[in-house]
Regions:
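Internal, conserved structured core segments that host functional sites
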Residues: 85-142
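Acidic/His metal-coordination segments adjacent to aromatic residues that form catalytic metal sites
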Residues: 2-16, 74-100, 147-151, 165-188
Length: 251
């Protein structure tokens, strides 16, 4: 009987680059959907800038993993390794902010530790990206507080956004065999080590916003293994349409 091939350092590094790159790419594409649709001009511009930061991060990571354009535009849904949280629909503005708070709080804590990676590229990337993500986290926190401590409707909407996205948080701290090898080799930080700090940081924002921490729900996992929701398929159909329709086009 054939045995599975052992996971190599090259495989682990490539997979980790895809995880981080796909997170940034998918969330950047999601936020770009707000362009021209923000509740006010200032917010519209802010969300577009967040999207540009994330697409920039994705470009660096996917180009390091291989041909960035091909990885972004010519992979199928099952080949993407992003977490499920970032592919969730924008919903209304409050739901978008809730999703961004939950993701960027995790991303910020991860990048802080990734600066100590033994991998030179990842360490240098983290030193640059953590400054951008600090702003993302601040914006998401500020808007969560404004919405939560605002009108009855804004409070309801952001609470519903948190409830919707909360089930996807446990996946951020899941460690599978591939990630464990990356941790053991000093490539990636162990997310379990900052889960308590993450939950405390989110709880502090929610307390200031006069919001309750959502009740624990059955976690939904699988994004890191290519098991995605239908929402990612719809997103990729839009994002990949031109490159797949005209694969040899140049402009």
């Amino acid at each position: 009987m054939a045995t599975a091939s052992p996971v190599t350092d090259v495989d682990v590094r490539h997979d980790y680059l895809l995880r981080l790159g796909d997170d940034a790419l998918v969330l950047g594409q999601r936020l770009s959907e707000w362009c021209g649709h923000g509740p006010v001009l200032e917010v519209d511009i802010s969300l577009a800038n967040l999207a540009l930061d994330l697409i920039g991060q994705a470009t660096l990571l996917l180009n390091e993993a291989g041909d960035g354009d091909r990885l972004a535009f010519h992979r199928d849904v099952l080949d993407f390794r992003n977490c499920l949280l970032v592919e969730q629909p924008n919903g209304d503005f409050a739901q978008t902010i809730a999703r961004h708070l939950l993701y960027t709080t995790w991303q910020y804590l991860l990048l802080q530790r990734l600066t100590q990676s033994r991998d030179k590229f990842l360490s240098e990337f983290a030193h640059k990206a953590v400054k951008e993500v600090a702003y993302h986290r601040e914006l998401a926190s500020d808007w969560t507080i404004r919405l939560g401590d605002g009108t009855e409707e804004s409070t309801r909407r952001v609470a519903e956004g948190l409830d919707w996205n909360w089930r996807f948080v446990p996946e951020l701290f899941e460690v599978d065999e591939t990630l464990q090898v990356a941790i053991d080799h000093g490539i990636a930080p162990d997310p379990r080590e900052f889960e308590d700090e993450y939950r405390s940081a989110v709880a502090a924002v929610l307390s200031e916003a006069r919001l309750e921490t959502p009740a624990e729900q059955r976690p939904i996992l699988g994004g890191r293994r290519g098991h995605h929701s239908e929402h990612l398929g719809h997103l990729l159909a839009v994002m990949q349409f031109l490159p797949r329709t005209y694969p040899d086009a140049t402009w």
